[in-house]
Amino acid sequence: LSKRNAVPGWRRALGWFTRIFRSDDVASRVTRASAGAQRPVTTGRRLVVLGASGGTGTTSVAVGLARTLAAVRNAPTALVAIDDNDDLSSRLDVAPVPPARSDLPATDFAAQMSAMTESGRIAAIRPHEDAAAMARGLGRFFAVTVIDAGQHPPAQLTSEAHAVVIVASASAAGTTAVTRTVAGLHAARTNPKTILVVLVPRLPGDEVTRHAQHLRASGITTFVLPHDRHIAGGAALHLRLAAENTQVILGELAAATMNPPDR
């Protein structure tokens, strides 16, 4: 499954052929997303990815976002995983990542990397006790730290984040869960302008537009990932095997997370 392309070969060839003869905005979207994701940062940015409910694909989005930022910025990206489950190791194709011995940053970059598990340009780690402290410390060495925060991240982590990405199913229940999660973030003093939503369809052909429009009408920036059989497979996530539209949406999400919100 890890090597299964999201789009069959005949469809990729047909898509390439038809794009020659029609005008689409894929190239311009990729260019804009790439420019946005490459914005320079003065301090390490912390991007929290959380699930509005269980089984929404939070780890998949966190890994996809981290891989996209690492590729576009051409630099290592830190990935902090709060929950102790096997999703991260399978998505990164690495051995289970044990908790760190300390949440404090190392004395230098080499020492920090030796305490982390590498998968391509992603360096993964689990906090010892304090995820917020670890995320702050990693900012000494990494321009971007993505935190796979599960469903119930610490309030300090989300209030200090430069972006909070809520992952939900593209359904009525999903939008309700998003509304509830956003209310909880507001109560925890999370900056509303840092909040982004990613809707993930459970099956091919699921109606997603109506649910996305509902959230956007509420003032919530919302992205919709297409159903992608490579990501849905549950194995190691490789951007090159994802569908073109999946890659574009992840790029646009990456650009949005790097856009500094008004404080």
Residue ranges and their predicted role:
Residues 47-107, 139, 144, 149:
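Walker A/P-loop NTP-binding active-site region of P-loop NTPases
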Residues 177-195, 212:
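Conserved C-terminal guanine-recognition region of P-loop GTPase G domains, centered on the G4
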Residues 1-48:
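Extreme N-terminal, non-catalytic leader segments
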Residues 49-50, 80, 124-127, 146-148, ...:
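Conserved beta-strand segments of the P-loop GTPase G domain that flank and frequently precede/overlap
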Residues 116-159, 175:
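Phosphate-binding/switch loop-helix module in NTP-utilizing enzymes
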Residues 161-179, 204:
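Conserved Switch II/interswitch segment of TRAFAC-class P-loop GTPases
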Residues 96-128:
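Nucleotide-state-sensitive switch-loop elements of NTP-binding domains
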Residues 202-247:
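Beta-strand-loop-alpha "switch" segments that mediate conformational coupling across diverse proteins
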